[in-house]
Amino acid sequence: MTSINLNLTMAFSLALTGVLVYRSHLMSTLLCLEGMMLSLFILMALLISHSHMFSVSMAPLILLVFSACEAGVGLALLVKISTNYGNDYVQNLNLLQC
């Protein structure tokens, strides 16, 4: 395993650990999820370019699009929770009335 792959794997595992540790605050969880998605994007792009599998070269771009959609929905939920309750605790998610 090269050092770049090792660093990206460690970045993904640190972001996953951050999600598990800071799961009570929505903002911290969203930042850690973005870190996970960014490390997955870079790892996929490097592996595809290294192995010359250009038939799946759209996969990192699709992952990036889904990551942007996830960030948009997460930030909208964060704004809704923070304006209604004044904090970003995840425990407030079950209190939202749709």
UniProtKB/Swiss-Prot annotation:
Pfam families: Oxidored_q2 (PF00420). GO terms for biological process: ATP synthesis coupled electron transport. Gene3D superfamilies: 1.10.287.3510. This is NADH-ubiquinone oxidoreductase chain 4L. The gene is MT-ND4L. InterPro entries: NADH_UbQ_OxRdtase_chain4L/K, NUOK/Mnh_C1-like. Core subunit of respiratory chain NADH dehydrogenase (Complex I) which is composed of 45 different subunits. One of its GO terms (molecular function) is NADH dehydrogenase (ubiquinone) activity. It comes from Dactylopsila trivirgata (Striped possum). Core subunit of the mitochondrial membrane respiratory chain NADH dehydrogenase (Complex I) which catalyzes electron transfer from NADH through the respiratory chain, using ubiquinone as an electron acceptor. Part of the enzyme membrane arm which is embedded in the lipid bilayer and involved in proton translocation. Its main location: mitochondrion. PANTHER family: NADH-UBIQUINONE OXIDOREDUCTASE CHAIN 4L (PTHR11434:SF0), NADH-UBIQUINONE OXIDOREDUCTASE SUBUNIT ND4L (PTHR11434). Keywords: Electron transport, Membrane, Mitochondrion, Mitochondrion inner membrane, NAD, Respiratory chain, Translocase, Transmembrane, Transmembrane helix, Transport, Ubiquinone.
